[in-house]
């Protein structure tokens, strides 16, 4: 199937590694020129060079900390200038610390909201006027299934994600008249560079051996495994296609049918 993406342009946040890198690569493979951002310059530039060499597309690395408004504005403006227009905005940067309520500090909660939620708000504040002026666009927000499938160990991510999901649905209602459509993608556990750290945190909080903690997430998923980066990236690329423009104001889980309550019960038995 031709996704009608060849020649399009995209901004992808958190693009130096993990899901963001996978999305940038998958978009470029479909003929999209991409501007990516991250806080660390060296891995960001290495990723851009790697994807550009592989796909022969224009990949623009822009160093930015999306917890800072000035950096966010600079990323959007530089990306727009380098690409000429912004057809697709993929918000992906940011993560929230897992943990139970008594282990989460004020700084943990601030981190959850400042980057994972407010980072998306900042990007949209600057990119949506560009899309309005050019006659339309597509926004895909990577959020997380914690916002719709609560778990006591993921209370901070759940709160930030629920806010992001509400933001996505609300903006779909506001900007439809401008031919801008919105969709949220809610991954469950994904095998990224961060996965080992998340398992270590679960092992700490639940007082489990690392090997046992690593089995908790797969045990809560009917398919028996966590997702791979490429699986999430493929869904995002499909949703970014003009063919999917009517998939608007909605959210899609990609978590293998995970049952979060089962994961909590498995923890409670330990």
Which residues does each predicted region cover?
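Conserved glycine-rich cofactor-binding loop
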Residues: 9, 16-18
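Conserved glycine-rich Rossmann-like NAD(P)H-binding loop of the short-chain dehydrogenase/reductase
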Residues: 32-46
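Substrate-binding pocket helix/loop in short-chain dehydrogenase/reductase
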Residues: 100-101, 108-113, 217
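Catalytic loop of short-chain dehydrogenase/reductase
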Residues: 140-163, 168-177, 189-190, 258
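Short C-terminal tail/terminal secondary-structure segment
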Residues: 149, 237, 248-270
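Short, small/polar-rich loop/turn modules that mediate ligand/substrate recognition or access, typified
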Residues: 176, 181, 247-249
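A conserved structural motif in NAD(P)-dependent oxidoreductases
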Residues: 206-210, 221-232
